[in-house]
């Protein structure tokens, strides 16, 4: 008997991940994510620890589902970013003031109970306290402006300016949190070649 085909969330929701190098409006359906929240400089140890915790839970849940006959590909890393206080536009704040929520998309059939069970099993193995902070969340973004950014993360401001102009041209404004979808691994790709989908809800 041939092996069952793995579910590929990016292929299943391809329209939501199309991002040319010009800003465009997209409609994003509600989606389930494994999520963990943190703050501070993304080059600091806390960020890496939470990325590791998120992937540990993601692969544990995936293997559990594979044994049950519901195999799927673990999706890539995504993140929500925002500032705090009176200046919520994070580009105006120091990196130590940034707030972020790291995300990995999961199929709709994944439940909070199995995420909790995966985290518990990892904690029993002594895999790190950050594991306990991984939760299942549903993100409801709806209408968004989306665009592909190529280059260093620190140069995203120019891409965001183009996205903001797109929103204004359609009589819309930014709302909610800045969303990044990482298509490149910064450990293996030069900064000028990094590819990141930028998304921002509008209304």
Regions found by a protein language model. Give the residues of each.
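A solvent-exposed interaction/effector surface
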Residues: 1-203
